[in-house]
């Protein structure tokens, strides 16, 4: 019988141990304690980050929002009907990211960046974090370039600049979305990329908006992010941040982008729902204490960044170009109450507001912009020269007209000067009316404002102002196309352009009918 050598045995065992392939991995796992209303409580998870993605069986993901002593409260992203008590949940070590890039232009995606338009996968896109810190003070640049909305009343009186946050506020069904969509349509040839975020809207409404963008040739330049009314509160809360990340892709690479949040009232309601289900203490109107921070950290990401920021971000690939992300948040008020919690918050965060009024809308003044309450805190710095020069008296005329109209109801005999002011105000009010999906070019707008400013409307009947304006613009585009093209390209105002406009209008009034 062969004798076993102890040293041999130890060598064999040692060799086996050295060759053993140990492929075990450390996993941070916990157990689902409860599932209800899209909120999951998990016990046993350690080292979880706030906002970290948590993976559940069946490819379902959640996001950690409440980090308590003995449990984690997470919100489910999507359907949660497959989850049950006792299931395992594991940390991923990642925060939520969405696809970004030019491949998304012309597409409709959900809040997580998944395409929902039936046009196939997005292709080779990169991803970026949904929650990002806004650029610091040093990296910002002052706003001095315009974003043309195509609306006379906005571009003349409440100008919006690249990198500005301009709130559109008003009651339901008075043209807030229409104004934002027209602003997007007007960017199709301006080189500004657009992102439209629909929060809590009906799917039929969103489908109609997408169709209108396509009909007007603006969809190819736009990303549509949808978290419809039928989707979970978590997705409605995340959609604006996802859209903002998609817009920042362009800003950080020296491009200009415009983002519309339609609307932030519904995002605040969704966040309130999540917070109450997570048992956070309610505050005013049952909103949580951090609802201001919800909107401020989103809207602060809209900015104009300097050449140095773009150069540093792109590692020198893009030089000498500033980038901007302009935000048009929409807030819906109840019976014109702008002093409610969410409206006052957003008014204080933004750089001005366009206030739409129900009474004006119902009396046929559309867009129903109340020039007295609306303001742009960037102002003339972001206006083209010709519009800035010609729009000075428009706001004053409208403000004086409103004041005098109220006074004139009680006074029977008015002096000549007051009567002239009233008549001029009526004509300017009529001139500010504009059809939907018909944004105007700088030259068309300048022509209308010039006619009002220089008194060419005095002898035109109020009821015929609209047809006069249409005929005048058609006449100039036909007979003075060179002058109109010059205004559109440069936007300057000098004696030559002044003389050309004056002579053209005088000729039109002498030879044409309207």
UniProtKB/Swiss-Prot annotation:
Pfam families: ATP-synt_ab, ATP-synt_ab_C, ATP-synt_ab_N
Site residues by UniProt (Required for activity): 374
Keywords tagged on the record: ATP synthesis, ATP-binding, Cell inner membrane, Cell membrane, CF(1), Hydrogen ion transport, Ion transport, Membrane, Nucleotide-binding, Translocase, Transport
GO molecular function, one term: proton-transporting ATP synthase activity, rotational mechanism
Name the record gives this protein: ATP synthase subunit alpha
Domain of life: Bacteria
Subunit comment: F-type ATPases have 2 components, CF(1) - the catalytic core - and CF(0) - the membrane proton channel. CF(1) has five subunits: alpha(3), beta(3), gamma(1), delta(1), epsilon(1). CF(0) has three main subunits: a(1), b(2) and c(9-12). The alpha and beta chains form an alternating ring which encloses part of the gamma chain. CF(1) is attached to CF(0) by a central stalk formed by the gamma and epsilon chains, while a peripheral stalk is formed by the delta and b chains.
Topology in membrane: Peripheral membrane protein
Annotated Gene Ontology cellular component terms: plasma membrane; proton-transporting ATP synthase complex
Gene responsible for this protein: atpA
InterPro entries xrefs: ATP_synth_asu-like_sf (IPR023366), ATP_synth_asu_C (IPR000793), ATP_synth_asu_C_sf (IPR038376), ATP_synth_F1_a_nt-bd_dom (IPR033732), ATP_synth_F1_asu (IPR005294), ATPase_a/bsu_AS (IPR020003), ATPase_F1/V1/A1_a/bsu_N (IPR004100), ATPase_F1/V1/A1_a/bsu_N_sf (IPR036121)
Compartments (UniProt record): Cell inner membrane
UniProt-listed Enzyme Commission number(s): 7.1.2.2
Signal sequence segment: none
Organism: Pseudomonas putida (strain GB-1)
Residues that coordinate or bind ATP: 170-177
Role: Produces ATP from ADP in the presence of a proton gradient across the membrane. The alpha chain is a regulatory subunit.
């Amino acid at each position: 019988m062969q004798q076993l050598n102890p040293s041999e045995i130890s060598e064999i065992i040692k060799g086996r141990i050295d060759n053993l392939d140990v492929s075990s991995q450390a996993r941070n796992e916990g157990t689902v304690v409860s599932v209800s209303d899209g909120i999951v409580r998990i016990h046993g998870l350690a080292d979880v980050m706030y906002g970290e993605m948590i993976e559940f069986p069946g490819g379902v993901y959640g996001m950690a929002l409440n980090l308590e002593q003995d449990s984690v409260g997470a919100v489910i992203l999507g359907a949660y009907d497959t989850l049950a008590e006792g299931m395992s949940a594991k940390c991923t070590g990642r925060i939520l990211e969405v696809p970004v890039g030019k491949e998304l232009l012309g597409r409709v995606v959900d809040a997580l960046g998944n395409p929902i338009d039936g046009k196939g996968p997005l292709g080779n896109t990169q991803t970026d974090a949904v929650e990002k810190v806004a650029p610091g003070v040093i990296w910002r640049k002052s706003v001095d370039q315009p974003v043309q909305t195509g609306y006379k009343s906005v571009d003349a009186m409440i100008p919006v600049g690249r990198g500005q946050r301009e709130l559109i506020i008003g009651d339901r069904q008075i043209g807030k979305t229409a104004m934002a969509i027209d602003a997007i349509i007007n960017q199709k040839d301006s080189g500004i990329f657009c992102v439209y975020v629909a929060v809590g809207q009906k799917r039929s409404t969103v489908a109609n908006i997408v169709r209108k963008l396509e009909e007007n040739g603006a969809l190819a330049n736009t990303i549509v992010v949808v978290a419809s009314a039928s989707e979970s509160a978590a997705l409605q809360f995340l959609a604006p941040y996802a859209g903002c990340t998609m817009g920042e892709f362009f800003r950080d690479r020296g491009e200009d982008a415009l983002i519309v949040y339609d609307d932030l009232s519904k995002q605040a309601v969704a966040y309130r729902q999540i917070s109450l289900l997570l048992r956070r203490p309610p505050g005013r109107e049952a909103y949580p204490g951090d609802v201001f921070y919800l909107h401020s950290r989103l809207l602060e990401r809209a900015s104009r960044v300097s050449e140095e920021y773009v150069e540093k971000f792109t590692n020198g690939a893009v030089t000498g170009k500033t980038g901007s992300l302009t935000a048009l948040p929409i807030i819906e008020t109840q019976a014109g109450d702008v002093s409610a919690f969410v409206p006052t918050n957003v008014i204080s965060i933004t750089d001005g507001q366009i206030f739409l009024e129900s009474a004006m809308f119902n009396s046929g003044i559309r867009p129903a912009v109340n020039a007295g309450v609306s303001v742009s805190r960037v102002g003339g710095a972001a206006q083209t020269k010709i519009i800035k020069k010609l729009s000075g008296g428009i706001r004053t005329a409208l403000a004086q007209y409103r004041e005098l109209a109220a006074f004139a109801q009680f006074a029977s005999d008015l002096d000549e000067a007051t009567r002239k002011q009233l008549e001029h105000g009526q004509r300017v009010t009529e001139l500010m009316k504009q059809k939907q999906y018909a944004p105007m070019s700088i030259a068309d707008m300048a022509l209308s404002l010039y006619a009002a400013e220089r008194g060419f409307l005095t002898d035109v009947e109020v009821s015929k102002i609209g047809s006069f304006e249409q005929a005048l613009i058609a006449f100039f585009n036909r007979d003075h196309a060179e002058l109109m093209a010059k205004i559109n390209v440069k936007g300057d105002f000098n004696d030559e352009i002044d003389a050309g406009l004056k002579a053209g209008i005088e000729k039109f009034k002498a030879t044409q009918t309207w």
